[in-house]
Every structure is written in C-alpha cells, then in structure tokens.
Amino acid sequence: MYPAPDMSLWQGRIDSQEGADARRWHQWMRPYADDAEAASVLLGFASDEGVRRNQGRQGARHGPPALRRALANLAWHGEQAIYDAGDIVAGDDLEAAQECYAQRVADLLACGHRVVGLGGGHEIAYASFAGLARHLSRHERLPRIGILNFDAHFDLRHAERASSGTPFRQIAELCQASDWPFAYCCLGISRLSNTAALFDQAQRLGVRYLLDRQLQPWNLERSEAFLDGFLQSVDHLYLTVCLDVLPAAQAPGVSAPSAHGVEMPVVEHLVRRAKASGKLRLADIAELNPQLDSDQRTARIAARLVDSLVN
C-alpha cells in the first residue's frame, strides 16, 4: 500500500465570479485512484538522504509539498485530468525508497499514465529511470531510452553508496548490465562544478553535453539543433531538471546554487521542445530545497516547469 496524497496542500484562490473557465490547479487536481483514466500523475520523492551522502545541504525532502503549494494557485489551461499519487518518503534507507519509487513508476506507466516526479534530491533520477526501464522491458528487448538532464553537474560520481551525485553512473551500470545503450545528454554543465575526472568519465561513457555558457538566448538555434540530434537518436525520453542548472538569482533554493547557470526562458523552451518530440515518457524536477529558498522563487520556477511538462 502507498500513502494517500495530502490533498490539503491543494488550496488557493477561487474566482467563481469569472465562470467555469477561471480554473486553477487546486480546483482541477484529484487524488489518484487505481481506476483513474490515463493522464498525468504527480508522484513525490521526499528524500534528501542522497544529498546528505553527497555532502550537500539537506532540506530537499520538503520539496514535494512546497512544489505542490506553488502549483496550487497557478491558472489551469488544460482539459485533461491530472492526479496526485502522494509521496514515497525516504528515511536513511535510500536504496529501499528508490526501489519503492521505481516500482510505483512502473505500475503507473503500465496503466498508461505519464508520471511527473517531484523531488527531493537528484537521487530521484536513478529511481525514475529504473521504473521506466522496468516498464519498457516488458514490451521491448532493447529499448532506446534517452536521458535528458538539465543540470550543472554530470552526477556520474563513483561512491560506495548511492547519493545525489551518483544517479547517472548507476543508470550507466544498469544499462550495461542489461546490454542496453546508455544515451545520456546533459544540458547546462558548469566547468567549475565538475572535476577533470568527471569530464573524463563523461567522455568514456559517450555523454553528450553543452556547457552553461553555450546555452545562451543568442545561441538558441545551435542548442535546438543539438537537442534535436539527440532526440532523433532515441525512441523513449526520460527528462529530468535539476534546479541548480538555473542561476542562483533565479533558483536560490537548492543545495548547490549556480554562479552562472542557464536562464529560465532557455530551460523552459528546451523542455517544451523535448516534450513536443512525442517521445517523453517520464519526467521529474529535482533538488528543490524550500529551507534555502527566498520568497518562494525556486518553488515558483519549479511549478512553472511542471506546468510546461503537463499542459
């Protein structure tokens, strides 16, 4: 049994005098039920154990409810259903929580839903991919899954235990064990936040990436072409946004704020472009730490990105 969602988080303004079209997220959201029609489903991963293991600043376990509160009062422009499936809560047993989240993702995908994960530290990424892989392996022997990560960090660290710095190395190992291709594209990499050893590791694994300084509005056509080339090489897409890809002025509420980063309009544009490919199967937003946020700036940006993925 999974814990029920806390629907009390979905509160906000009601503009009843404006008519039926004056809807907001909190009015449209429904708790997930097993007989729900295929739609977008929000699933939280309340964890920062991976951040702690990675020597980061804790607090991301409070990210999922903060993100729901930021979403609640946004105007709703869709017609499709949307559900809240609650949170998988991780204590200090991160590996067990990742397994539980992966199974929940696989079950939801099997029912025809598109899952949008709410983090939580970026340790959510391994759990998300494992769930997608579990689902696709039931239907395809050699699925071509693309991993699109908006992030200042490669997150390819070697460590004795899983952390927020290891998810894509874990995914690479899972792909190797399954004899699947490891198709990883990372947009927004900071040279100053990744050692030469991590760049070498990325090269060995065939990672495609663009640096934060390359992802500028004046260079958008090249960024689009780079992304399109990656999307054309895969059949299924897992998209994850680590909020530390954004400049610290826009997203202060993360464990490791970026001095440079990639501006929100560029990130949002490329997220929407990836979604428009028709290959998106699963997405998540990671590293929201409301304890470090200022005026809910990071939560509001995260909410806008979730809306871009859903509507």
Curated annotation (Swiss-Prot):
Tree of life domain: Bacteria
Gene3D superfamilies assigned: Ureohydrolase domain
UniProt KW Ion transport keyword: no
Entry binding sites for Mn(2+) 2: D151, H153, C242, D244
GO biological process, one term: putrescine biosynthetic process from arginine, via agmatine
EC primary class: hydrolase
Signal peptide as annotated in the record: none
UniProt-listed Enzyme Commission number(s): 3.5.3.8
Catalytic reactions on record: N-formimidoyl-L-glutamate + H2O = formamide + L-glutamate
UniProt-listed InterPro entries: HutG, Ureohydrolase, Ureohydrolase_dom_sf
Cofactor: Mn(2+)
Binding residues for Mn(2+) 1: H122, D151, D155, C242
Keyword Transmembrane: no
Pathway(s) where this gene product acts: Amino-acid degradation; L-histidine degradation into L-glutamate; L-glutamate from N-formimidoyl-L-glutamate (hydrolase route): step 1/1
Keywords: Histidine metabolism, Hydrolase, Manganese, Metal-binding
Pfam families, sorted: Arginase
CDD domains noted in UniProt: Formimidoylglutamase
Cofactor: how and how many bound: Binds 2 manganese ions per subunit. Can also use Zn(2+).
NCBIfam families named in the record: hutG
Misc: There appear to be two competing pathways for the degradation of N-formimino-L-glutamate in P.aeruginosa: the two-step degradation of N-formimino-L-glutamate to ammonia, formate, and L-glutamate (via HutF and HutG), and the direct hydrolysis of the formimino functional group of N-formimino-L-glutamate to produce formamide and L-glutamate (via PA3175).
Family per record: Belongs to the arginase family.
Oligomer status and interactors: Homodimer.
HAMAP family the UniProt entry points to: Formimidoylglutam
Chain's role: Catalyzes the conversion of N-formimidoyl-L-glutamate to L-glutamate and formamide.
Protein name: Formimidoylglutamase
Source species: Pseudomonas aeruginosa (strain ATCC 15692 / DSM 22644 / CIP 104116 / JCM 14847 / LMG 12228 / 1C / PRS 101 / PAO1)
